């Protein structure tokens, strides 16, 4: 039984999604909804986000809707206090949603060195029992480093949303 699940995955631009009305988002959110319901029915009581646009933002929207039906908490743990400060207004509005959850913190005041990202990843993994990732090793991004750390942690449960699964949901 997982109680705290880290949620992360591709950013919108990594998927070639640049419009909020892109029909692929509906399919992705349908998959997230199914998976989140399964996690909740199996005892999840926290979903932890990193504050990234794309998959995390869509998952956050789903999680906020599900809070009307299920009793669970949502947290955003940013890498830096100034996360998103250089974003455009539309993206800052999305960032604001990440700050309107049950728990919000950051691990560092600001960027000082690349080692902070490794420390941040360790912190996230050590404070969650599992992860839900939209990631495929054939379409690598920086998430591969986080995934490698997860795979090294004993009894860390990793669930994936894959492109194949999205195709199955699309065909339903």
From Swiss-Prot:
InterPro entries: YspA. Signal peptide: none annotated. Pfam families: YpsA (PF06908). Belongs to the UPF0398 family. This is UPF0398 protein SAG0300.
């Amino acid at each position: 039984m997982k109680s705290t699940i880290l949620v992360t995955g591709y950013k919108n631009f990594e998927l070639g999604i640049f419009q909020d009305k892109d029909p692929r988002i509906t399919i992705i959110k349908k998959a997230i909804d199914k998976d989140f319901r399964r996690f909740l029915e199996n005892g999840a009581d926290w979903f932890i986000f990193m504050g990234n646009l794309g998959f995390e933002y869509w998952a956050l929207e789903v999680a906020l809707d599900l809070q009307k039906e299920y009793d669970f908490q949502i947290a955003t743990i940013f890498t830096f206090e100034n996360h998103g400060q250089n974003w455009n207004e539309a993206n800052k509005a999305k960032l604001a949603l990440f700050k309107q959850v049950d728990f919000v913190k950051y691990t560092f005041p600001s960027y000082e060195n690349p080692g902070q990202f490794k420390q941040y990843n360790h912190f996230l993994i050590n404070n969650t029992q599992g992860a839900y990732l939209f990631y495929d090793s054939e379409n690598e991004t920086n998430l591969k480093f986080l995934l490698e750390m997860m795979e090294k942690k004993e009894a860390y449960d990793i669930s994936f949303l894959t492109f194949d699964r999205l195709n199955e949901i699309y065909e339903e």
